[in-house]
Amino acid sequence: MSGTLYIVSAPSGAGKTSLVKALLDAAPEVRVSVSHTTRGMRPGEVDGVNYHFTSREEFLAMLERNEFLEHAEVFGNLYGTSQRWVEKTLAEGLDLILEIDWQGAQQVRRLMPEAQSIFILPPSQEALRQRLTNRGQDSDEVIERRMREAVSEMSHYVEYDHLVINDDFAHALDDLKAIFRARQLRQDAQQQRHAELLGRLLA
């Protein structure tokens, strides 16, 4: 049984990374894709765990070889997802999360229309600005740029299958878990998972 591909998108500061990490802690059968990026490593990040950090030259060479399922440029940095790794992980029966922006999501949907997509929103612009400020990673100028980008990004929520509002973290996490659980209980998935039982019941 092949796994399900999930696209998870959100504006910077909406809590996507924290929610996905909490979901992974509770769901061992789910994996998260590690993207390639040309942006610099932030404090606490580990190469190969958070991202595959690479040079712009190497990234463009991989792009030329058609190695990416999707790619996008965000804040002047390039991001991409290895198509071969995605296909291998799904073939192993594992569910896989792609944490990508709306541009990448559009590319993935064209190639893999069966992918499930989830958009995470903050409860307000004020809450989003506060979260970006509390990070302590960016200057006021960068925060203003991120806020402008966020408004543009959030307008694409209508393209997604599911919408999660991250007002209360625990509630948002429950919503995220419910999306994954409902997918696992679909008739076709259950039929594959319990083929032997169904055979005995209908014998």
Curated annotation (Swiss-Prot):
SUPFAM superfamilies per UniProt: P-loop containing nucleoside triphosphate hydrolases
GO MF annotation, one: guanylate kinase activity
GO cellular component: cytosol
Keyword Nucleus in record: no
NCBIfam families, alphabetized: guanyl_kin
Keyword Nucleotide-binding: yes
InterPro entries documented for this protein: GK/Ca_channel_bsu, Guanylate_kin-like_dom, Guanylate_kinase, Guanylate_kinase_CS, P-loop_NTPase
Family from the record: Belongs to the guanylate kinase family.
Subcellular location: Cytoplasm
CDD domains named among the record's database cross-references: GMPK
Species name: Pseudomonas aeruginosa (strain ATCC 15692 / DSM 22644 / CIP 104116 / JCM 14847 / LMG 12228 / 1C / PRS 101 / PAO1)
Alphabetic keyword roster: ATP-binding, Cytoplasm, Kinase, Nucleotide-binding, Transferase
Catalytic activity as recorded in UniProt: GMP + ATP = GDP + ADP
PROSITE patterns: GUANYLATE_KINASE_1 (PS00856), GUANYLATE_KINASE_2 (PS50052)
Protein name as it appears in the record: Guanylate kinase
Binding locations of ATP: A10, P11, S12, G13, A14, G15, K16, T17
Functional note: Essential for recycling GMP and indirectly, cGMP.
EC number: 2.7.4.8
Enzymatic class: transferase
Domain (Guanylate kinase-like) ranges: 3-181
